[in-house]
Structures are given as structure tokens and as C-alpha cells.
Amino acid sequence: MKHIARKRFGQHFLTDRLIIEGIVEAIAPLPGQPMVEIGPGLAAMTRPLVERLGHLTVIELDRDLARQLRSNPQLTVIESDVLRVDFLQLAEQVQSAGALRGAASQTPSPCKLRVVGNLPYNISTPILFHLLDAVEVIEDQHFMLQKEVIDRMVAMPSTSDYGRLSVMLQWRYAMENVLYVPPQSFDPPPRVDSAIVRMVPHAEPARLDVKLLSELVRVAFSQRRKLLRHTLGQWLEQHAFSGEFDVKRRAEEVPVAEYLALAQQVQTGTAQPEKIELL
């Protein structure tokens, strides 16, 4: 019986064989690597991935699809909302299971988790933020997303796409758009263009309180057209910031590095030797 895509799950199933091959080549899975696929759906990517890996863990919310996936002994199926999955715990479980299968000897040690998937477009941003909590145990991520979301992720300052998502993700990842995927590659076709993004965690990111940085950036971009003195300036005063930061700019004009430096100063209560003036 054919599975009908469910709108409430944001389901669009990948069917283009050439695109699937291109995605798998971009991921370049190796035997024994610990990998998790989010939203395997009808297993279009799952099958070629598991052929190369030997075993694959998948997270699927749709009960009917999860039941079908369990028929493959090479898959470990987690039937759950991905936003409820603890990826720190999952990484440990996947790595331990791989060691029991004798896979650990085929991959570098320690083996970090590789995460892939065709993310539901209606909750893709929450998933990306959810994974920030587990970035220390992740080797890389390859996701199918709306192209416009990827444009925002990799955007540079002083562009219309540059925003909170750009700052938060560029803090932790080096990212690139590796493959364009047209709507006709799916069934049913989405009304948007899609693409594959590669996300590789930075080896030594700035050590920051993620909640503080997220709040700082959210406030900064809350009114994009206004100067920062009307938004972030007030927030800095509320946090008794004694350093200097130029708030006669709009949020989109401030580079990622400056946001990170400012968050570091607010977090530690110190100012850099070269002052950034709060004007």
C-alpha cells in the first residue's frame, strides 16, 4: 500500500535517483561510522547509506513509516519527535552499539556522530538550534533544507539574509551549500527550492553561554531597521555592561565575531583592552 505524505509531518519524499546519488556522494559514508538519519521517510537515502555503513540509526515520527523501517535488520529505529531526542545520550548509545558490532576498529577514535537528514521544513530551524546542545559530539551534519534557510545560515553581514540564524550557527559551524535540489525531485513537490547544506563544527569555537548569546542576538535583530541603541543598547544597560560597543549601527551591520566578543564580555563582566564604545 502506497504511503500518502502527511502534511502535518511536513512530508515531501525524495524520489530523484541522481539527486539521491549526489547527496550520498556529498556525505561520503564509510563502513562502521556512527550515523543518525533524521526523517528517513520512504528510505530513499536510507538504503544507499546503510549499504555503505553497514548499520544506521534513524529517527522517524510517523508510526507507519517506523514500522516499515523496522523490517530492515541493519536499521535501529527511534520512533520519536526529533526535538525530544537527547543527542548527547544518543551519540553514546550509537557509539557503544557500533563497538559491540566490531565497527569501532574501522573508524578513527573517538568516533563522533554524523547526522544527516531531509528535515521537515516546518520545524527545520528548531531542529538546528536543538542540535547546538550536542555539537561537541558531532563530526558533521548534512541536511536537506529550504534553499532560503541555507542562504540565511551562510549569509554575510550587511545583507538581507543575515540574521539571528546566521550568527548562532556560524558561531559553531563552518557551513556550505553543496547541492541544489529542485522541487520536482520530491513527491509531492514542495513550493520552494531546496538544497543540501554541509555543517562542520569548529574545532575551537568561542566558549559562550548559548542562552546568553541567543538572547543577545534575538534582541539585536528584534527590530532590524532600527539602530541598535533602541534595542541592544537598552539590553546592555540592563546587564550592567561597562564596556564599549557602537550601537549607532543596525544589527545586520555587526559581524559574527563582534557579537561573540560582546557576548564574552557580558558573560565575564569584563571589557576588552581595545574598547568597543557604547555610543
From Swiss-Prot:
Name which cysteines form disulfide bonds.
none
Q: Which domain of life is it from?
A: Bacteria
Reaction(s) this enzyme catalyzes, per UniProt: adenosine(1518)/adenosine(1519) in 16S rRNA + 4 S-adenosyl-L-methionine = N(6)-dimethyladenosine(1518)/N(6)-dimethyladenosine(1519) in 16S rRNA + 4 S-adenosyl-L-homocysteine + 4 H(+)
Q: Please state where this protein is localized.
A: Cytoplasm
Q: Which SUPFAM superfamilies did the record assign?
A: S-adenosyl-L-methionine-dependent methyltransferases
Which residues make up the binding site for S-adenosyl-L-methionine?
Answer: H12, L14, G39, E60, D81, N118
Spans through the membrane: none
Q: Which GO terms describe its cellular component?
A: cytosol
Entry EC number(s): 2.1.1.182
User: What terms describe the molecular function in GO for this protein?
Assistant: 16S rRNA (adenine(1518)-N(6)/adenine(1519)-N(6))-dimethyltransferase activity; RNA binding
Keyword terms of this UniProt record:
Cytoplasm, Methyltransferase, RNA-binding, rRNA processing, S-adenosyl-L-methionine, Transferase
Q: What does this protein do?
A: Specifically dimethylates two adjacent adenosines (A1518 and A1519) in the loop of a conserved hairpin near the 3'-end of 16S rRNA in the 30S particle. May play a critical role in biogenesis of 30S subunits.
The Swiss-Prot or TrEMBL record describes its family as follows: Belongs to the class I-like SAM-binding methyltransferase superfamily. rRNA adenine N(6)-methyltransferase family. RsmA subfamily.
UniProt protein name: Ribosomal RNA small subunit methyltransferase A
Q: What is the source species?
A: Polaromonas naphthalenivorans (strain CJ2)
